[in-house]
Swiss-Prot record:
Name of this protein: Probable C2H2-type zinc-finger transcription factor orf8
Signal peptide coordinates: none
Positions of the UniProt region annotated as Disordered: 1-49, 62-86
Its biological purpose: Probable C2H2-type zinc-finger transcription factor that may regulate the gene cluster that mediates the biosynthesis of brefeldin A (BFA), a protein transport inhibitor that shows antiviral, antifungal, and antitumor properties.
Family: Belongs to the GLI C2H2-type zinc-finger protein family.
Swiss-Prot/TrEMBL keywords: Metal-binding, Nucleus, Transcription, Transcription regulation, Zinc, Zinc-finger
Coiled-coil features, chain-numbered ranges: none
Organism field: Eupenicillium brefeldianum
Gene3D superfamilies registered for this protein in UniProt: Classic Zinc Finger
Entry's induction text: Coexpressed with the other cluster genes on brefeldin A production optimized medium.
């Protein structure tokens, strides 16, 4: 043994540290589901792409490349309390992508790893008639979910404002006939009339004037027939008088 010996140290040498870092495999982010990588493995926040940073730290990337508030990676995917808090430069961002609910595209077979079932999706073509883009919420909603048929809208209006059936015209007429028939008709109880009924009060008054002799009687100029009303005398003269018929 030589007399010179190196002092023993508990700390690993720099060479051993580099060997340890080189042995760490590069896990693809698509298959990685564990807690976010820590700084002790040799990965810095600048080495991560914006998409990887989103998966690891839970940052929501907006339309203009700005990042929202950072969330704890351990609270979302594992038991680690380590979290990233950083700003992603706009130059490192891929083409604009948006947060879309996974249930908006059923049957795709994609299982989201993001909280609240959110997926990263590229915007569809502006000419696509099956989707509507809403910049306020950055979500795409199918057009059939927003459409409402005329039949459905009419049913909703009928349920909110029920229509009241108005009584028919025939029922009103029948009701008026019943009222008129229930009214007592005027009658004459003079000698010889014995309660004769009249359709109106004016007819009863005229009958009483005729019986009292207050009305001048009208005579036919041809045959001399006497009439209590001039209307009846005129009809008799022009249509029924036998003297006119014989003279013609």
């Amino acid at each position: 043994m030589s007399g010179s010996s190196e002092p023993y140290s508990d700390e690993p040498s720099q060479h051993n540290t580099h060997r340890f870092i080189d042995q760490i495999p590069d896990y693809p982010w698509d298959d990685y589901s564990g807690p976010p990588l820590q700084q002790s493995r040799g990965y810095s926040s600048q080495d991560l792409s914006p998409l990887q940073t989103y998966y690891s730290s839970g940052l929501s990337v907006g339309l203009n490349g700005q990042t929202g508030g950072s969330e704890s990676g351990g609270s979302q995917s594992g038991g680690s309390d380590y979290s990233y808090s950083q700003n992603v430069p706009a130059s490192l961002l891929p083409p604009a992508f948006y947060l879309v609910r996974s249930d908006s595209y059923p049957g795709t077979g994609i299982e989201s790893r993001l909280p609240n079932s959110y997926l990263l999706s590229y915007p569809p073509s502006p000419t696509d008639p099956n989707t509507y883009y809403m910049p306020e919420t950055s979500q795409f909603l199918p057009s059939h979910d927003l459409s409402l048929s005329v039949q459905d809208s009419s049913e909703i209006l009928d349920s909110l404002f029920p229509q009241q059936e108005s009584p028919s015209v025939t029922s009103n007429d029948e009701f008026l006939v019943q009222i008129l028939s229930s009214r007592p008709r005027p009658q004459c109880w003079d000698h010889g009339c014995n309660g004769r009924e009249f359709s109106s009060m004016s007819n009863l008054l005229r009958h009483q004037r005729e019986r009292a002799g207050a009305v001048t009687k009208a005579e036919c100029p041809v045959c001399g027939a006497v009439f209590t009303r001039t209307t009846a005398r005129n009809i008799h003269v022009f249509e029924r008088c036998e003297g006119i018929g014989r003279s013609l």
